[in-house]
Amino acid sequence: MDKLLERFLNYVSLDTQSKAGVRQVPSTEGQWKLLHLLKEQLEEMGLINVTLSEKGTLMATLPANVPGDIPAIGFISHVDTSPDCSGKNVNPQIVENYRGGDIALGIGDEVLSPVMFPVLHQLLGQTLITTDGKTLLGADDKAGIAEIMTALAVLQQKNIPHGDIRVAFTPDEEVGKGAKHFDVDAFDARWAYTVDGGGVGELEFENFNAASVNIKIVGNNVHPGTAKGVMVNALSLAARIHAEVPADESPEMTEGYEGFYHLASMKGTVERADMHYIIRDFDRKQFEARKRKMMEIAKKVGKGLHPDCYIELVIEDSYYNMREKVVEHPHILDIAQQAMRDCDIEPELKPIRGGTDGAQLSFMGLPCPNLFTGGYNYHGKHEFVTLEGMEKAVQVIVRIAELTAQRKS
């Protein structure tokens, strides 16, 4: 398929890791490099209205090639890779005709094993693109970028009937800022799809409601030998707080539609401790109940403390479940499912145990479910993607454009 693998390998060669806790958007210079490269490529392909905002959102339009009042649709991917694992000097391995068993990742001890990742059993005979065991791969979401770019080329070269196709590439999705500076009005699509999913057939329109909880604990430190009745150990208070959080509602104990509390970081001394939790739940009422639970725990543990010692809790909502917005427009899912079936793929509707730019965009007036990329094991050195899965994603994008052209606004 037209330059698909070449594009992907080109994009992952650029280090575009985003960085949390940074004010500027994009948060890293590497993202600008990929955005400028993509802008140049879009212009070379002849797309119109190619714009790159000061906040790093790249937009372009492939004009309709058929007359009529056809709804404009969009496809969106993000240029950054996760801060969780290095994205510098990515050295992909190409494993053709995978025959099963362990795949050595580079020259070290790291392997990609079907024992740990049973999905490999389903991928026999396919071409796998893996890491060398030292970095992530960047299929999340450079596979999506390569697929969108290739689909644009296919639509042009084969003169497939389509309406206006908008594309956008966003920064800082992995640190939750990807959609904050997205101009929905300028994008001017009736609906869109993020291309940021996993295995072939995945179609996602439900995601977690998400919030962050930051807890500041101020204690009182004195010499341990004279501490009775005076010392207030902030670390002990932190331990008591975590002991009150339901242990069976953590990420490692939940799946499917189950929500969780996750202690993401904790640091401190006797004098001061800080805890950072994330809260996730698909159900809005349960989500609100989880936030109340954290407030109740903080009040309980902080009861009776000396006035100079205290527990401060700040809860900030991150994003909400896009289901309530997407289901108002069922044809968006119908078209995607039909496109998959037309490409001999059985759609797999499943909840996202996470979030996407599409979740925020759906609440900004742009309904935006998520399509598969063909990638697996994101955010780590065991990440990989199949070439066949990427090719299927291109076919689905093209077919969605074609099916939409058969509709009238």
UniProtKB/Swiss-Prot annotation:
Extract one GO cellular component term from the record.
Answer: cytosol
Per the record, a Pfam family?
A: Peptidase_M20
Could you tell me what reaction this enzyme catalyses? Release of the N-terminal residue from a tripeptide
Cofactor binding mode and count: Binds 2 Zn(2+) ions per subunit.
Hydrolase among the record's keywords? yes
GO molecular function terms noted in the UniProt entry:
metallopeptidase activity; tripeptide aminopeptidase activity; zinc ion binding
Enzyme active site? D80, E173 (proton acceptor)
Kindly list the biological process annotations in GO that this record carries. Answer: peptide catabolic process; proteolysis
Protein family (similarity comment): Belongs to the peptidase M20B family.
This protein is called Peptidase T
Recorded source organism is: Escherichia coli O139:H28 (strain E24377A / ETEC)
